[in-house]
């Protein structure tokens, strides 16, 4: 799904005796009803109860909270956050096959890297504050903006920028994802993983979807207070383990309990590792 029209799908989980209930909403990650988890009130609560998820989310939260207390981040966080945004953009571009080198003259020729850097600028400083405001009111508008920035050099027709594909089900799944973003009380690392995974699965725009998905995960982290200054760099973890990242995303898309839970734990691990990357930035800043 994405942040607008989603068709949250059921994931049947034998989890502490939970059973399917008539009229239950369906959870993100499952491709069909025979491989899905059943949701009661908060659509994401069953995910929190999957093995290892709650503990992984707690570790991610604690690691990010700790790095925010680093002496370099107490007042100098705008500097460290700016460096984090650049590292995140370069790593996100590389995951999708883009270049990572920043030319000395500042002219970035690679379209994937150029788009990722534009997204990084939108997730830094005053621009981030504005983007978070949009995300909290209208997640789909924020997604459209992210795609416009990420794919500006990738599409032949500008009319495609910010517009989800017209394929059946895309709008519905985006809508359900958006409602989940606005209403779920799930731990922020879990919500970030679901938003990320659903966008990777749906590929709603047909271009730059990976960059958009990872940026949306960052928006969840910032807007929820998990990583309020956007100091973490989980993208480095995903790049270093690119094949494992892609395999975990495929597991999420399959919708099995193991696949969905494995993806969430993997993403929580990336957030925890991203806090270590943030610490290295802060240490270098003094």
Q: What residue spans do the PLM features occupy?
A:
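FIC/Doc superfamily catalytic core
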Residues: 2-286
